[in-house]
Amino acid sequence: MLKHDLDYLELLSESFPTATEVATEIINLEAILNLPKGTEHFLADIHGEYEAFIHVLKNASGSIRRKVDEVFGGQLRQNQKRELCTLIYYPREKLELVKQSDERMEDWYMVTLNQLIKVCQKAAEKYTRSKVRKTLPPKYSYIIQELLHEDGVNPNKSAYISSIFSSIISTGCADDFIIAISETIQRLVIDHLHVVGDVFDRGPGAHIIMDTLMKYHHFDIQWGNHDMLWMGAAVGNASCMANVVRIALRYANLDTLESGYGINLLPLARFAMDTYADDPCTVFKPKLAQADQTYDDKSVYLISQMHKAISIIQFKLEHQIIARHPEYKMDNRDLFHLVNFTDGTIKLSSGVYPMLDMNFPTVDPADPYALTEQEQNIVDRLMGCFMRSEKLQNHLKCLYRHGSMYLTYNMNLLYHASIPLNKDKSLKKVRVGDKTYAGRELLDKVEEMIRTAYVAPEKSDQRLAAVDYMWYLWCGPDSPLFDKAMMTTFERYFIEDKATHHEEKGYYYVYRQEKAVCEMILKEFGLEGPDTHIINGHVPVKAKKGELPIGAEGKLMLIDGGFSKAYQSSTGIAGYTLIFNSQGLHLVQHEPFSSTRKAIEEMEDIKSITVVREVTSHRMLVKDTDNGHLLSKQVENLKKLLQAYSYGLIKERKK
């Protein structure tokens, strides 16, 4: 045995000072290694739609309903199963409804407690008792463990269980216990959650989603383009901040900004009302759902004015970054100087086009990108709100702690949008700073820049460059989070000809349906074999046009969650989520979610069907997972320590 091995084993012996303790730990770890792997849940492109997100989280993309079916089969009617599932999803709210309609609560409690324990037993069966114990609420841990490990078929045990239930009911703890056991089931059904990008966007509750994630037991995030926009704003990028505010106003979603993060929009509102007092702001009218009665005409007009004001500010701020970074090669996004302020047209490389709006009181034709003093004041005040928002900064910290550009996890490669490619399908070399990078090196360098924007000394050149780069990640042509020739925001506002709105996608989107390309990308990230996959979001799958969520002969899984209601008319569905358990991958297609109220009162669940079921080459055990490989290494080292004790190379220390 080599000296450095002995040095390490000496350290290990401090944790396991006797051969008996080593042997016990080996037995425990090998038992864990031979259990079925935990269930992973993959979601992407939530876009601030918190109600649908929370429901999918609670029902685990149909996993809880499947557990209920497995336990009760034909013993319960469909309506009874729906009622039980609703109770597990929303225990507090459902209990209130039951109390209003059921006078025989003691009988209901007895039946329900029995049903919940059976579902919990099913959810816990693949885990060690130790792991289950850690998921239990401390105040009920002992009693739930007793119930989980008792067999109700035995008459003596059945009486014992009934006596426990009676005690729970008679002491007035039934409601609290039902809530605790329901939330335990939710935790046990999903072992790990992957959010493959875009928590943020136009939906009303990104802050609620982040609050929910921060309380979740195990999760990770692969940053999306909208996440990067908010992260950029939160670290001090004014262009990112202006984009965030513009998008919120474009979709009349002010809840996240004002209620969620305490961003004061009043200075912007006053400025917009004064500056655009006689301007109809027609092209800046917010996009409202047909049934949206939230805003009256006066409010819609004010939002339109604010929308125009921040859009003009955004275009000016973006010019500053483009001017500071010629290496971005984004001069084609500076368009104000191409406007003919005399005849109301704009000259692009593709032709001359009439402008839909020519009222620009804050734009000086001789210096179109200069911010007025008032505009600069608005930027400073808004930026101050973003930087001082305690909740936003806490959420930013969470995004950094749990987030990354990509993740390799249990033979799957997760990233939100793209791996830039050349026309010949090779990995594209992209400039970041002074050097070029491709593939995995590119994503590693990009992540380094993102983290530098957060941790480097304030006002250092390193930090300022990294903060600017976060805006490039939002809309830069070679950004792995965007990967399109250009973002045509200006054209969409001011030019009617839709040909100018086109955003040419990078070659990744052209070639990602080819198996060889996906295998090349997987290999670049160290993954090879029949059970490897790319899990991708970002681009909605248009199911009603025949598009499929699986490509490259099974190597590519597209799970744009379709939570954004704006896309549901074009996709025909509410997107896809993915479940990966010990049997394999289950790609689940969802119908649109109505509301939390309907889910509780009418027991309306999201209609979901498994559209792809890919069985792994063998039932996956813990030892087949990334964590299992680490545990196997621990076992290997413990066996060496046991051998060292046996041969007297290391002396046992009695306690």
Curated annotation (Swiss-Prot):
GO BP field: gluconeogenesis
Family: Belongs to the FBPase class 3 family.
Pathway linked to the protein: Carbohydrate biosynthesis; gluconeogenesis
Name this polypeptide is given: Fructose-1,6-bisphosphatase class 3
InterPro entries: FBPtase_class3, Metallo-depent_PP-like
CC cofactor: Mn(2+)
Name of the gene: fbp
A GO molecular-function descriptor: fructose 1,6-bisphosphate 1-phosphatase activity
Organism whose genome encodes this protein: Porphyromonas gingivalis (strain ATCC 33277 / DSM 20709 / CIP 103683 / JCM 12257 / NCTC 11834 / 2561)
Ranges in coiled-coil conformation: none
Its EC number(s): 3.1.3.11
Catalyzed reaction equations: beta-D-fructose 1,6-bisphosphate + H2O = beta-D-fructose 6-phosphate + phosphate
Assigned keywords, A-Z: Carbohydrate metabolism, Hydrolase, Manganese
Superkingdom of origin: Bacteria
